[in-house]
Regions:
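Structured C-terminal helix/loop/strand segments within mature extracytoplasmic catalytic/sensor domains
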Residues: 3-46, 77, 140-143, 196-288
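Short pre-catalytic segments that frame enzyme active sites
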Residues: 31-80, 96
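Second-shell loop/turn segments in exported
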Residues: 72-79, 110-125, 133-140, 175-183, ...
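Short, well-structured active-site flanking segments
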Residues: 93-110, 205-210
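Acidic helix-start/capping segments at beta-turn-to-alpha-helix junctions
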Residues: 103-119, 142-143, 166-169
């Protein structure tokens, strides 16, 4: 079972419906400190979505240009789902809860429906297998104050961790959290801006920690470079794939978000990843 299936399986463990109508807000396209001379291009990526409802953001750091498909959805805040593991891993590293890719959290003995979760896991293993209980332990050890401080520095969506223990979409407390269809929300554009801030802009993060984070986000070789990212899967046809491609030290950031209850049987983190890769391949060909 791959990590995207792990997320889907985990999110349906005695899931409770949250309803479709969420209080959402449109957000600025970029962080306040990134607004200078940013350009937006509205694009049509519908051919890659094949009838699935969703949106996509691609950000070219060289030209400082955002390419937006379904702009309104790109600026609408939703749950980050398991893409938040990028931030929780960084928070763990920055606060010395985690020290390297082999930092281990102890398994509690509960029999989970996902076999790869049923043992002690390293950071690398937990990230690859999208293990909720591992990152639940990490954020609890880091604590609410330091998590919130990091979210404010990143300008990460609404930075709302008020439902710290989550919305009880899963029956086990260690499989819930504020980032799983709960209080924390972020838009696809904000996802891209966050990644750009972490990996391409001046910040106060430890360079070794950023390198560890980058290593665990590695997905595959991509053309003449590498693809890095994280999937996220939720209930009722919600899914993410966010990350960047790096070629000769130049990065192109992206976020694909799907939300389609009518096609929920085919919507997954894997599907979002497939769409993102197709968009990026076409985008690169047009920009060679």
């Amino acid at each position: 079972i791959n990590s995207e299936q792990h997320e889907n399986n985990a999110m349906v463990i005695e899931q409770k419906s949250e309803g479709e109508n969420q209080n959402i807000q449109n957000t600025n396209t970029v962080k306040e400190n990134e607004t200078s001379a940013v350009k937006d291009n509205i694009v049509d990526y519908s051919e890659y979505f094949q009838g699935i409802s969703g949106c996509a953001v691609v950000y070219d750091e060289i030209s400082n240009t955002y390419f937006l498909y379904n702009k309104e959805n790109c600026e609408t805040e939703v749950s980050p789902l398991s893409t938040f593991k990028i931030v929780s891993a960084l928070a763990g590293l920055e606060n010395n809860v985690l020290v390297n890719e082999n930092s281990t959290m102890e398994y509690n003995g509960v029999k989970y429906p996902i076999d790869t979760w049923n043992s002690n896991l390293t950071l690398k293993e937990a990230f690859e297998n999208s293990c909720i209980w591992y990152f639940r332990q990490v954020v609890d050890i880091v604590g609410q104050e330091d998590i919130h401080t990091m979210l404010k520095e990143l300008q990460y969506g609404n930075s709302d961790i008020s439902e710290w223990n989550g919305s009880k979409i899963n029956s086990l407390p260690e499989l819930n959290g504020f980032w799983l269809e709960s209080s924390l929300k972020i838009s696809p554009v904000q996802q891209v801006a966050t990644l750009n801030y972490v990996f391409s802009r001046e910040n106060n993060f430890n360079a070794e920690n950023i390198e560890i984070l980058k290593n665990i986000m590695y997905v595959t070789e991509y053309d003449n470079g590498c693809l890095y990212g994280k999937t996220g899967s939720g209930t009722d046809g919600k899914a993410w794939f966010v990350g960047f491609i790096e070629v000769n030290s130049n990065k192109t950031y992206f976020a694909v978000y799907l939300e389609d209850v009518q096609n929920k049987d085919i919507v997954s983190g894997n599907k979002a990843k497939e769409i993102a890769i197709n968009i990026l391949s076409n985008w690169e060909n047009k920009n060679d």
